Each structure stands twice: as structure tokens, then as C-alpha cells.
């Protein structure tokens, strides 16, 4: 086997593994940092093998298109958040995942040259979505509990553990399953692709995700209007036949569920007509989201230019809660601190500022302007593909106006893959072959090599830092060498505050055993450094309050506790450390 053939095979194997892992990462039982490291490593290896295959083939370089160029600009700005984030500990995972998305897009641009290859991997992605739908439906019967998670209040979640996450994933793939059904030429493919959309609709119904069901309705309406506009009566007929079949299957499954021994949280299934009443009514969720959105607006106003860095919303939320939401915050303030703003545009604005939001909007404009161009000028079959592809991306974006299932659950990778598919069709069928001029060969190869080197260095550093923090420092397995471990962690992430916080925690523990004032001085010195690195991490106030308590400075200790308890997690931590017989376990 030649080098070119080996690189070609390895690239496709890596892409296959990446597509499967991005959909089923929860099944592998990896910790968050481990799954992030693995998927970014797969993207890096895919880019490297694609570059080797590309260079040995001596094929003509694709020009950098408007869609891919605008997305890489946005992802690049998010990666630069390393330099403007208010907390590197909270941002480093999201930054690396943004980098992984850019790396995947570059690898796809190098490797996928044939529409046949693109269709093959789309088939794989849709098969993964169909299988997830089967799992979501089977969840209702609570069988195979060793491999299929139990539902929460009869709400299907797939392997994701949350109904809205499942809904986002399925909505991203649903329209394409319909396209592949109508475009399939063999009976076997038609049967498989005919089953997939039915399963996805049933899974979305059983998920009880109101937002997901609403977006599904919008997608179905768009598809029906498209078929009517095409005057394709056979497809309109098939559309209504499928809806009838789904209805029959749904009530049949409900009947079987009632006959089973599954404990039902509801005496009757929640009806879509009860969207504004009952326990799962939309008003409470909407009120919560208004708080999230207005709090995000408050953060954006203070950090409007560059934002606070990816993944920092949860950290700043307690500091801004109530400033912008005085009329909504009552009864909410101490319920939960959300991990994100539940809106992709607000989240991008708070994370990356007006610069990042502007780049993302430019990317969306590029996607829809080129999509509209293809719908008007491409051959008929390509127009169909572009319509359903654009509808998939649109469904994802609409659902993410009330969610933010993008970075924290690896959905950036299937999103990037579908964006590339549209980009591929644009490059193939546009009369104007390039919106951006071709790049010099030396610069082209140099930039890609730099991406690989920087990505590899960043991924290795990230893994080493996270492994030290979560495997040795926080669990206390390396207490004897804690100073050495924290110093090593600081070399991997000089701007991170967690090593200093853990060192402070250890010094306070030492003081409890040996009340030496010098130990408190050392602990306070660590906290001063932490305050410079991560000023919004309220854990430092818990530790500083303990130091002030040891020093009998009760007034200042009380003020520090009050400030820290704005965060519900810190309230629980502070209570545990005050009342527990072993505060080091808190």
C-alpha cells in the first residue's frame, strides 16, 4: 500500500470514528475532558492524514469559500478567547472544542472531493440519528436497562440525559432523512430512509420537549410548502400518509406502554394542547429563560467588545442576576445557576462580544445567501438537497434560540459537517468558483501545518492540566506532593486559578491540624494570586472567609460569605465546610 492510499484510508476511518463518537460520546463513559481530548485528537489526526493524502495526490487546491472562511473566522475569534477570557479554567474546554471544529472543517475541505464521499458520511450520520431515535422510543418501555437509560418522568432522552439535548440532535438530522428517502434509488435504501424520519418524529414526541416539537412542526410545514410549490403531488401524498402512519404508531405505542408494567408519571400522556397548562407548561420555562436572556444582556453591556470568554456565563450569572431582571428574579434567584443563557446568539454575544457576534452573523448571511443562490440556480436534484440541508441547519438554529446545545455536548461537529456539505455544493455548482482567491501553496501548507502543531500542543497541555486537576489534585490523591503538582499544573495553564484554590484549601486544612499563623499568611498569598487570575470564581471568597474566621474577623467573614452565597453551588459548599466534621471532603 502506498503512502497516498494509506493516508486516504486512515482519513476516512478517522472521519467515520469521529462522526460516531460525536453522536454517542456518552456511551463510552469518558469524563468530559477525556472525551474532548479524544474528539479533538481525532480531528487533528484526520486533518494530518488529509493533508498527507492531499499532497501526495497533487490535486488542485479548493479556493477558500465564503461559507468556510466566515465560519473559520468566527471559530478563530472564539479560540482567541484564551487571551481575553475572564476565567481560563472555565473557558479552556470550550476554546479547544471551537478549535476542534475549525480543524474538522479544514480537514473536510482537504479530503472530501467527491459528492459520493459526502453522501456516504451523511448516511452514517443519519443512521446514528435513527439508532438514537430507536433508543428514545424503547426507553418508554424501560427494557434493556443495562444499556438503555431509564426515562425521566417518562420523557425520552436517548443517551444524552436531557430531552432538549435529544431534540436538538434529532432536529439537526430530520429533514435530511426525508431527502434521502425521496432520492433513494433502491428499495432497501427507501425502506431504511423511510423508517428513519418516522422514528425521529416519534422520539421527539416521546421526549416531551415542547421547543423540539414546535421546531419539528415548523420543519414539517416548510417541507409541505416546498412540495406544494414544486407541484409534486406524489410527495404531498406520501407526506400525509407518513403523518397518518406516525399517528397510528404513536397511539399503538401508547396502548402498549399502558399494557406494560412501566410506572407512568402521568395518568394520560401530556397533550400538545396543554402546552400552557399542567406541570410541563411552557410559562415557567419561558420565565426562567427571560431571566437567563436578560442576565446575558447585562453581561454583554459590560463586556460588549470582546465578551467574557467561552464557558464563563455560569460563573458571572450570580453577579448579574437581579441587575437586569428585577421584575422577574423573584422566586428564581436561589433555584439554579444555568450553565449557559439558553440562546445561541446571546451566548455568543456574552462569550465573544460584538466582534464574535458580528462574525457569526456574517457566517449566517453567507450560509443563507449561498443557499438561496443554489436554490435558484443549481440543478433540480441539487436544489432538493440544498433545501433539506438548509432546513436542517435552520431547525438547529431555531431550537438554539431557546437552548444552547452547541459546544458543551460536541454538537459543533455534526453542525460543522452539515455546513461543509452546503459549502461543498456551493463550490461545485457556483458559476463563480471562488469568493476568496486561492492561497499560495507554501502559505496553504504552512498554515495547515501550524494548525496541526498548535492544535497538538494545546490538546496535550489541556489533557495534562485536566488530568492533574481532576485525577490527583482535587481528589487529594497527591496531597503529599501537592505543591509540586500545583506548580506543574501552573506550567500547563499559567492563567488558571484552580491550582491556587486547591493549594489554599490544603493550607487551610493544615492550619486546622496545626494553628500556625504563617500558614494563613501563605493561604492568603495564594488567594491574592487567584483573585488576579479568576476574579469571578466565588470559591475564593469561601476560603478567604474561613481565613478571616480563624483570625476572629467575623464582620469581614460574614461579608465574604454573603458575597459567595450569590452562587447556589458556593452556598452549598460554604454550608458543607462550616457544618461538616470533615470539611476537606466538601
Each predicted region: which residue ranges?
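Transmembrane signal-anchor hairpin modules in multi-pass inner-membrane enzymes, especially those
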Residues: 1-80, 86-93, 100-127, 179-194, ...
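Membrane-interface anchor segments at the N-terminal boundary of transmembrane helices
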Residues: 27-45, 340, 347-363
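Interfacial juxtamembrane loops and adjacent helix segments
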Residues: 144-157, 263-287, 299, 310-350
Amino acid at each position: 500500500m502506498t503512502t497516498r492510499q494509506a493516508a486516504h484510508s486512515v482519513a476516512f476511518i478517522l472521519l467515520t470514528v469521529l462522526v460516531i463518537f460525536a453522536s454517542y460520546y456518552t456511551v463510552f463513559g469518558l469524563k468530559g475532558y477525556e472525551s474532548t481530548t479524544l474528539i479533538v485528537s481525532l480531528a487533528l489526526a484526520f486533518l494530518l492524514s488529509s493533508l498527507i493524502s492531499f499532497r501526495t495526490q497533487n490535486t488542485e487546491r479548493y479556493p477558500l469559500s465564503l461559507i468556510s472562511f466566515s465560519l473559520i473566522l468566527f471559530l478563530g475569534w472564539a479560540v482567541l478567547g484564551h487571551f481575553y477570557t475572564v476565567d481560563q479554567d472555565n473557558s479552556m474546554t470550550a476554546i479547544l472544542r471551537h478549535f476542534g471544529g475549525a480543524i474538522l472543517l479544514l480537514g473536510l475541505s482537504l479530503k472530501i472531493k467527491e459528492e459520493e464521499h459526502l453522501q456516504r458520511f451523511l448516511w452514517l450520520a443519519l443512521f446514528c440519528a435513527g439508532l438514537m431515535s430507536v433508543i428514545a422510543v424503547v426507553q418508554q418501555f424501560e427494557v434493556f436497562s443495562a444499556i438503555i437509560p431509564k426515562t425521566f418522568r417518562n420523557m425520552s432522552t436517548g443517551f444524552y440525559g436531557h430531552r432538549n439535548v435529544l431534540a436538538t440532535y434529532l432536529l439537526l438530522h430530520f429533514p435530511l432523512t426525508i431527502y434521502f428517502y425521496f432520492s433513494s434509488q433502491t428499495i432497501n435504501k427507501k425502506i431504511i430512509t423511510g423508517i428513519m424520519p418516522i422514528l425521529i418524529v416519534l422520539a421527539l414526541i416521546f421526549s416531551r420537549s415542547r421547543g423540539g416539537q414546535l421546531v419539528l412542526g415548523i420543519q414539517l410545514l416548510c417541507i409541505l410548502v416546498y412540495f406544494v410549490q414544486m407541484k409534486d403531488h406524489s410527495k404531498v401524498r406520501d407526506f400525509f400518509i407518513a403523518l397518518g402512519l406516525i399517528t397510528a404508531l404513536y397511539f399503538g405505542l401508547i396502548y402498549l406502554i399502558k399494557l406494560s408494567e412501566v410506572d407512568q408519571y402521568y395518568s394520560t400522556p401530556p397533550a400538545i394542547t396543554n402546552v400552557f397548562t399542567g406541570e410541563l407548561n411552557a410559562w415557567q420555562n419561558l420565565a426562567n429563560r427571560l431571566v437567563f436572556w436578560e442576565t446575558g444582556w447585562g453581561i454583554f453591556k459590560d463586556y460588549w467588545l470582546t465578551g467574557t470568554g467561552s464557558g464563563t456565563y455560569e460563573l458571572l450569572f450570580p453577579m448579574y442576576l437581579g441587575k437586569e431582571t428585577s421584575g422577574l428574579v423573584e422566586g428564581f434567584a436561589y433555584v439554579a445557576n444555568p450553565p449557559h443563557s439558553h440562546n445561541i446568539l446571546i451566548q455568543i454575544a456574552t462569550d465573544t462580544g460584538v466582534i464574535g457576534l458580528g462574525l457569526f452573523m456574517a457566517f449566517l448571511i453567507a450560509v443563507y445567501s449561498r443557499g438561496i443562490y443554489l436554490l435558484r440556480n443549481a440543478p433540480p436534484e441539487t436544489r432538493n438537497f440544498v433545501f433539506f440541508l438548509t432546513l436542517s441547519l435552520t431547525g438547529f438554529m431555531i431550537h438554539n434560540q431557546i437552548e444552547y446545545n452547541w459546544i458543551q455536548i460536541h454538537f459543533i461537529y455534526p453542525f460543522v459537517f452539515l455546513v461543509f456539505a452546503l459549502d461543498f455544493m456551493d463550490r461545485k455548482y457556483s458559476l463563480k468558483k471562488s469568493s476568496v482567491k486561492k492561497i499560495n501553496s507554501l502559505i496553504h501548507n504552512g498554515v495547515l501545518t501550524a494548525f496541526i502543531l498548535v492544535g497538538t500542543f494545546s490538546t496535550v497541555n489541556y489533557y495534562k492540566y485536566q488530568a492533574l486537576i481532576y485525577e490527583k489534585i482535587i481528589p487529594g490523591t497527591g496531597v503529599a506532593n501537592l505543591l509540586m503538582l500545583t506548580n506543574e499544573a501552573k506550567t500547563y495553564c499559567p492563567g488558571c486559578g484552580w491550582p491556587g484554590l486547591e493549594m489554599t484549601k490544603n493550607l487551610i486544612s493544615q492550619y486546622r491540624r496545626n494553628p500556625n499563623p504563617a500558614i494563613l499568611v501563605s493561604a492568603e498569598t495564594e488567594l491574592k494570586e487567584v483573585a488576579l487570575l479568576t476574579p469571578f470564581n466565588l470559591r475564593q471568597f469561601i476560603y478567604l472567609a474561613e481565613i478571616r474566621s480563624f483570625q476572629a474577623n467575623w464582620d469581614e467573614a460574614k461579608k465574604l460569605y454573603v458575597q459567595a452565597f450569590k452562587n447556589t453551588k458556593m452556598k452549598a459548599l460554604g454550608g458543607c465546610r462550616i457544618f461538616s466534621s470533615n470539611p476537606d471532603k466538601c
